Amino acid sequence: DPERPPVVKYNPAFDAPSQAKHPLRMLTPHPRYSFHTQGDGKDSFINNIKDHRVEVDGFYYWIIRINADDAAERGIKMHDLVKVYNDQGAVVCAALVTQRLPRGSTHGYESCATYEPLGEPGNSVDRGGILNLLTPKKSQIKKGHSMGNSTALVEIELWDGKAEHNVAPAVAAE
């Protein structure tokens, strides 16, 4: 199988062609402070952990970490509400500006969020923090069922408060 050679080698990501439109690589590892949704009741003590969520105007927003230089280019400051988006959807998060990520990379935990669309589900931004809305839906390889949902190409901008977001039509896996 050419997709799974005996010696592992680098293969460019299948979403690489969209990098001009969505230049930031978003990493979505397992959460540090809870396991998926267990122990994370969305209104629990976990909201008070400063690296987990940020309260803005009475709502606890999911955090997206962004390199300080990338943030400065976009006019983003610490705890600004930002729209993280690509052709699959959009999520509103609170920005955590850091030098701990290389340029071109962002980081947000993949779960423990609640889907809260601000308009028509599927055609509006989510303020609950479901970053997996932005990750690929297709299998990593043709002859297997491996998920590719730990990374995605995105763009981040200051959120203008609008609920609408046009989503590209779903495409079947190749």
Language-model regions, residue ranges each:
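Long, contiguous, secondary-structure-rich segments that constitute the structural scaffold
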Residues: A16, T37-E174
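Long, low-complexity segments enriched in small/aliphatic residues
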Residues: D1-K50
